[in-house]
């Protein structure tokens, strides 16, 4: 019996060991292949990506998706990823020749796969054991054919639905009793899907184990862990769990109130579960080893448009917002600003005398090291040009890395390298400043 216990402990240690060497922390770096085909300054090609790899233990390339007809794992952009096109799958895994310690994983889903909310293919696949077989076989084939070291499961479960704002902020938050949106039923078959996902993880790991492939889980923003993941049942078949603990608040989820997107700790009069610490404690409290838990850090900010009724202080939560702020000049995504786009809007010699939409935002730091930074510009007399953005910068990312060390967690997942300042434009010299600061603190 003692010999069996010793063997079990050794196997568990080896499973964690393939993610990182003893005593080290994981630093998983996400690379969205779509950034390869962007235009202008937001285009991230492999030559520009390479300076980041000296800091990364893993490169997570995304994103693959599910073909709903065949239930197979497929490229979401064959002309980009496969050999008939740009062959980015092989180019990315080929980076291991230059960086032999780097593990390269393929990510599935990640909120980048098109899903019909009325017929979610990620749920229908789970509902049939026969549907899981082609997914598992195709996943193994893709990983093996293109030289990946494993698979990152960014399974696109239904998300928590925030309540509509009616009246005061306090009344708004008081209505939250559960993380999955109070009155709204996120998934009527949640228990069935939880059991089936447990089976999928077990079957995938069994298929991967002979080749030593890594299997990781990414808990996507606003997916209810208690609803969809049987932590004790899946954790031994997972090499890591990335908690994507950001985007708790976004202008798409709540267009009338601007608030911190990714606080470390609970804020007053907020849902107590919308913070990094709660999500970490949920998993470790359900028997997930701390060494398998990685905290996700977004390299971008979430931006709301402010109105004259939003006030002048910028102190969150800011009421009477008006949805997404205009898109940035590089990423061209309304309501989202990459770190270099945020940096360019903070006070600097180039914008200090500008007015209107080009005027600088007022930066407000976080001396408590608990909630994050934000910057804002109040609306003008005509009700225009008001912006509020909550964001991650190198300093706040470093604070989260310190939290990870303090809590004895596995590491950090940086999402996404293409939204970090990979050209060094903010300081004029330092490339990937968020990634570098995280690495310096781990």
Curated annotation (Swiss-Prot):
It is found in: Secreted. Keywords: Developmental protein, Disulfide bond, Glycoprotein, Secreted, Signal. The keyword Lipoprotein does not apply. GO terms for molecular function: chitin binding; imaginal disc growth factor receptor binding. InterPro entries: Chitinase_II/V-like_cat (IPR011583), Chitinase_insertion_sf (IPR029070), Glyco_hydro18_cat (IPR001223), Glycoside_hydrolase_SF (IPR017853), Glycosyl_Hydrlase_18 (IPR050314), IDGF (IPR015520). Glycans are attached at residue 224. It comes from the Eukaryota. Residues 25-442 form the GH18 domain. Coiled coil: none annotated. Glycosylated. Its main location: secreted. One of its GO terms (biological process) is carbohydrate metabolic process. GO terms for cellular component: extracellular region. The keyword Isomerase does not apply. Disulfide bonds join 29-56, 343-426. Residues 1-21 form the signal peptide. Cooperates with insulin-like peptides to stimulate the proliferation, polarization and motility of imaginal disk cells. May act by stabilizing the binding of insulin-like peptides to its receptor through a simultaneous interaction with both molecules to form a multiprotein signaling complex. Lacks the typical Glu active site in position 156 that is replaced by a Gln residue, preventing the hydrolase activity. Its precise function remains unclear. This is Chitinase-like protein Idgf4. It comes from Drosophila melanogaster.
């Amino acid at each position: 019996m003692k010999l069996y216990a010793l063997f079990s402990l050794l196997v568990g240690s080896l499973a964690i060991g393939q993610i990182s060497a003893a005593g080290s922390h994981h630093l998983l770096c996400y690379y969205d292949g779509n950034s390869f085909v962007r235009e202008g300054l937001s285009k991230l090609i492999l030559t520009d990506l390479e300076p980041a790899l000296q800091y990364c233990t893993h490169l997570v390339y995304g994103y693959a998706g599910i073909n709903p007809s065949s239930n197979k794992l497929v490229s979401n952009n064959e002309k980009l990823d496969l050999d008939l096109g740009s062959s980015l799958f092989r180019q990315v895994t080929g980076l291991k020749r230059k960086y032999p310690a780097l593990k390269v994983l393929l990510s599935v889903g990640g909120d980048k796969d098109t899903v019909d909310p009325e017929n979610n293919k990620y749920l229908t696949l789970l509902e049939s054991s026969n549907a899981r077989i082609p997914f598992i076989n195709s996943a193994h084939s893709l990983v093996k054919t293109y030289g990946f070291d494993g698979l990152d499961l960014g399974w696109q479960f239904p998300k928590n639905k925030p309540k509509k704002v009616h009246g005061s902020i306090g009344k708004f938050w008081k209505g939250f009793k559960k993380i999955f949106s109070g009155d709204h039923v996120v998934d009527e078959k949640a228990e069935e899907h939880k059991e089936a996902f447990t089976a999928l993880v077990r079957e995938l790991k069994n298929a991967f184990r002979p080749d030593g492939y890594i299997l990781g889980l990414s808990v996507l923003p606003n997916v209810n862990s208690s609803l969809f993941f049987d932590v004790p049942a899946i954790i031994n078949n997972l090499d890591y769990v990335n908690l994507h603990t950001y985007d708790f608040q976004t202008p798409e989820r709540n267009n009338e109130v601007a608030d911190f997107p990714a606080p470390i700790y609970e804020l007053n009069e907020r849902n107590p579960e919308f913070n990094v610490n709660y999500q970490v404690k949920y998993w470790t409290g359900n028997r997930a080893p701390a060494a398998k838990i990685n905290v996700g850090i977004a390299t971008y900010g979430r931006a709301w448009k402010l109105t004259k009724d939003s006030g002048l202080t910028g102190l969150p939560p800011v009421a009477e917002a008006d949805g997404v702020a205009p898109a940035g000049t590089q990423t061209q995504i309304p309501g989202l600003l990459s770190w270099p786009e945020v940096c360019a809007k903070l006070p600097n010699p180039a914008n200090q005398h500008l007015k209107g939409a080009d005027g600088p935002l007022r930066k407000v730091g976080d001396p408590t090291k608990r909630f994050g930074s934000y910057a804002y510009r109040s609306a003008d007399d005509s009700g225009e040009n008001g912006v509020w953005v909550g964001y991650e910068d190198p300093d706040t990312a470093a604070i989260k890395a310190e939290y990870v060390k303090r809590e004895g967690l596995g590491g950090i997942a940086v999402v996404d390298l293409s939204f970090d300042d990979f050209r060094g434009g903010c300081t004029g010299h330092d490339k990937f400043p968020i990634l570098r600061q995280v690495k310096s603190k781990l």
